[in-house]
């Protein structure tokens, strides 16, 4: 899982990008790199195998400067973990550079096509062909934005991209088809990242790109379109997390810190959702799911991956015991391939900490096509799953940086209890029952 960052603004870009990359280290990586355009419109790249400190040493020995650029932490998929294969990658002219999270499935076919028009490749990666493909379409369209958009239509696979062209000053184009891309909004400055924590100390105002969308970012504005050039209005949200929650705060590592944050995540997830006077449970983000729907549901199916799937397994017992509704649990990657039986009397419950888990999103879409309602338990407001679900129980656990889930899992368990209590809270739920739970 690679990490991408980008910045356009008035600050010195190198220390800012290095700091953002450091906050993406939890995703895992084997190399790192940065590309910056300086005031003379020269594009400079520094890359290093291994840890981020190796890249910092390369930059110390060979400094670079500028006010916009992109950075990357790579986890090798195509090509060995070497400096040569580290991102960013450039085209033949050396003026277009790309960082990429994902996999291009048809890169070998595209590579052969590009070789026929004299493109020269210097790495073993699938990413490099993207820069060359944009270069090729730039010759045809003479417009960077159009060239990027046309190139995207040729790619098969999943990809999150940040792209710069040294001949287009103060511009970054960010693209999403699968992996998450977050755009941060500042005062005449904009940020691109794979996740919220890297940019949290710089801005609280963000939006997520949707699949098949691209953001054209310059120093003054950001504009979003789809791959067909249709304008898209992004949904901007304000992140309420305290930036300190994305720091270790004196703990030896994030996992230990997040273990100690579990009581807070439980409290914040329950906050204002249970009336101790009446015993009523309130789920406040049910966009298209009513009390009448809950009374109609005859079964619940849970689809999730990883830790969220384990939460779902435990949640099955909670919901069946409390709400007396039959519950089945599926691993999200298998859900849509087993031809599930669902209709308007079925509720699909999808669980995802990030709200961007690809297989869980696919399960949600499958269920909605079959006429079922979809409810999400999620930790990230504005994420893809939250946007597409008919209702959401936000867990309010704050950013979870540790790879082994702790507080996010605990908050999911609380949300599952709330869901189990909800259908009966407006009929026969008593305060002793709440206290016993």
Where are these regions (language model features)?
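Conserved short alpha-helical segments that host acidic/polar catalytic motifs at enzyme active sites
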Residues: 1-253, 261-298, 337
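Alpha-helix N-cap/helix-start and coil->helix boundary motif
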Residues: 104, 127-128, 309, 316, ...
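Conserved core segment of the aminotransferase class I/II
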Residues: 111-112, 424-426
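An acidic-aromatic substrate-binding cleft motif
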Residues: 258
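Glycine-rich phosphate-binding loops that contact phosphosugars or nucleotide phosphates
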Residues: 295-425
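Single conserved hydrophobic/aromatic residue that forms the stacking wall/gate
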Residues: 428-437
């Amino acid at each position: 899982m690679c990490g991408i960052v980008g910045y356009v603004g008035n600050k010195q870009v190198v220390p800012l990008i290095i700091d953002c990359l450091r906050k993406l280290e939890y995703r895992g990586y084997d190399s790192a790199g940065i590309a910056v355009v300086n005031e003379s419109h020269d594009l400079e790249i520094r890359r290093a195998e291994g840890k981020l400190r190796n890249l910092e040493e390369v930059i110390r020995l060979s400094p670079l400067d500028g006010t916009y650029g992109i950075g990357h932490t790579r986890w090798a998929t195509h090509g060995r973990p070497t400096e040569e294969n580290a991102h960013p990658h450039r085209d033949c002219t050396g003026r277009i550079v790309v960082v990429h999270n994902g996999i291009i499935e048809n890169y070998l076919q595209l590579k052969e096509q590009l070789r026929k028009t004299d493109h020269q490749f210097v790495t073993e990666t699938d990413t490099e062909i993207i820069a060359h493909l944009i270069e090729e379409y730039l010759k045809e369209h003479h417009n960077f934005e159009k060239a990027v958009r046309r190139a995207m239509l040729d790619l098969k696979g999943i990809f999150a991209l940040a792209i710069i062209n040294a001949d287009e000053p103060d511009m970054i184009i960010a693209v999403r088809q699968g992996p998450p891309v977050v755009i941060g909004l500042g005062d005449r400055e904009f940020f691109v990242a794979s996740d919220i924590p890297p940019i949290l100390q710089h801005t609280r105002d963000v939006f997520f790109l949707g699949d098949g969308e691209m953001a054209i970012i310059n120093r003054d504005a950001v504009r979003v379109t789809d791959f067909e050039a249709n304008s898209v209005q992004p949904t901007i949200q304000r992140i309420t997390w305290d930036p300190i929650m994305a720091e270790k705060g004196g703990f030896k590592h994030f996992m230990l810190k997040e273990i100690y944050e579990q009581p807070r995540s439980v409290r914040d997830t329950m906050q204002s959702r249970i009336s101790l006077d009446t015993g009523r449970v309130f789920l406040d983000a049910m966009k298209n799911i009513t009390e009448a729907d809950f009374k109609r549901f005859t079964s619940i199916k849970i689809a999730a991956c990883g830790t969220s799937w384990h939460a779902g397994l435990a949640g099955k017992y909670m919901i069946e015991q409390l709400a007396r509704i039959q519950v089945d649990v599926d691993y999200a990657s298998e859900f849509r391939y087993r031809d599930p039986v669902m209709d308007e009397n079925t509720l699909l419950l999808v669980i995802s900490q990030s709200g961007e888990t690809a297989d869980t999103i696919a399960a949600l879409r499958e269920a909605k096509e079959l006429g079922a309602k979809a409810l999400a338990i999620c930790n990230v407001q504005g994420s893809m799953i939250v946007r597409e679900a008919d209702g959401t129980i936000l867990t309010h656990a704050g950013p979870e940086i540790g790879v082994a889930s702790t507080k996010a899992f605990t908050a999911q368990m609380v949300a599952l209890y709330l869901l189990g209590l909800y259908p009966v809270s407006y009929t026969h739920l008593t305060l002793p029952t709440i206290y016993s739970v």
